Every structure is written in structure tokens, then in C-alpha cells.
Amino acid sequence: MEIVYSDMETSSCDYSFSHTDDEDSRSSLHPASPASSCGKPPASPAGLQQKKRRRGRARNETTVHVVKKNRRLKANDRERNRMHNLNDALDALRSVLPAFPDDTKLTKIETLRFAHNYIWALSETIRIADQKQGKSRDGPLLLPGLSCMADAPSPGSDSCSWPSGASSSSSSPSYCNSDPGSPAAMDDFGYLQTDVVYSYRNFVPSIY
């Protein structure tokens, strides 16, 4: 009886060993997934793609935000530099404008208006000087009273006499009728310039 029991135990052990070999082969053919081992269902390919898209969107939004911030900072720097250059140019313009003390503060528009009027006054002065220079080249280089005396036909003639009721002759020049002592005759070159300077100075008190 002992021999029979021992044979049965040996056969049962062999059967158990063969069963474990079958289980090992099955486990090697079908490996367990990490999700199933943890008790979670496996993720589908569609879910993985959605996660990748979300990550890409988050990265894109972050990049766009950084780019917008950099552009805004660069635009602010450009505007700041432009205003600094404009203020420097206006300060240089104020330094060359006349009739203003050093402590006078002018706004931008007042500085530009005053510079416009100052340039206009200078251009008018140059234009009047050119006109007078052209007239002096055409006519005799003498004062009005002296030219009248030089063009007189005779000392006793009435053609160049000063205005005393007698009519002038046709041979006398047109400027013989002016009084040599009058400001219009002596300051013929400067009376228009005086008007220009007067109109220019009328602008100065309105700025203060």
C-alpha cells in the first residue's frame, strides 16, 4: 500500500509541474498590460491624440502670449525714443529763436508757430532786400535829392525845384517831388523792413 501511495504522489507532482508549465507558456503568450495590472482600463488612441492636441494648444497659447508681450515692449520702446528725439529737436529749436529769455517755457505748438512766423519774417526781409537791390542796379546810385540836383538842366530851372506850388517838368525824374529831409526819402530802403519786423514782433507778446 505504501508503494501505491508513493506512486500516486509522484504522478500528482508531475501533473502539477506540467500544469505550471502550461500557465507559464500562456502568460508569456499574453503579457499583462500595465493598465490592467493597476486596475485601470487601457487608453484608446483617440484619447492619446486629444491629449497631444491639448498639449500643443497650451504650448501655442504660451508662445503667442510671449510674442505679443515682446512686440508690445518693443513698440513702447520705439515710442519712447521717438518722443525723446522730438523733445530734443524742440529744445534745439527754442535755443535759436530770438526774443525769449532762457527760463521761458513754450509748448510744442507754440514753438512751432513762433518758428513759422520767424522764418516768414526772415524770408520777407530777404525778399525786400533783393527787390531793393534790383531797383538800385537799374537806377542811379545817388540819393533822391542829389539825383534830382544832378539831373537839373540849369541852376535856375524850376524842373527840379522842391514842391512849392510849381509843376515839375517832364524831364525831371519821378522821385524829385520828395522832400530830401523826409523819412520816406532818407529811409526808403528800410521802411518795408520796419513793417515786417513790426508784424513779427506783434506775435511775440501773444506767446508770453
UniProtKB/Swiss-Prot annotation:
GO terms for molecular function: chromatin binding; DNA-binding transcription factor activity, RNA polymerase II-specific; E-box binding; protein dimerization activity. Transmembrane segments: none annotated. SMART domains: HLH. GO terms for cellular component: nucleus. Keywords: Activator, Developmental protein, Differentiation, DNA-binding, Neurogenesis, Nucleus, Transcription, Transcription regulation. Residues 70-122 form the bHLH domain. GO terms for biological process: anterior lateral line nerve development; axon development; axon regeneration; axonal fasciculation; dorsal spinal cord development; forebrain development; forebrain neuron development; generation of neurons. It is found in: Nucleus. Residues 8-18 have a biased composition (Polar residues). It comes from the Eukaryota. InterPro entries: bHLH_dom, bHLH_transcription_factors, HLH_DNA-bd_sf. Residues 1-62, 159-180 are annotated as: Disordered. Pfam families: HLH (PF00010). Embryonic nervous system. Expressed transiently in neurogenic placodes prior to delamination and formation of cranial ganglia. Expressed early (6-somite stage) in Rohon-Beard spinal sensory neurons and later in neural crest-derived dorsal root ganglion neurons. At 24 hours post-fertilization (hpf), expressed in specific regions of the brain and spinal cord. In hindbrain, expressed in presumptive neuroblasts adjacent to the rhombomere boundaries. In basal forebrain, expressed in dopaminergic progenitor cells. Transcriptional regulator. Activates transcription by binding to the E box-containing promoter. Mediates neuronal differentiation. Required for the development of Rohon-Beard spinal sensory neurons and dorsal root ganglion neurons, but not for primary motoneurons or autonomic neurons. Required for development of all cranial ganglia but not associated glial cells. Regulates epiphysial neurogenesis, acting partially redundantly with ascl1a and downstream of flh. Required for the development of basal forebrain dopaminergic neurons; involved in the specification of dopaminergic progenitor cells. Efficient DNA binding requires dimerization with another bHLH protein. PANTHER family: BASIC HELIX-LOOP-HELIX PROTEIN NEUROGENIN-RELATED (PTHR19290), NEUROGENIN-2 (PTHR19290:SF171). This is Neurogenin-1. It comes from Danio rerio. The gene is neurog1.
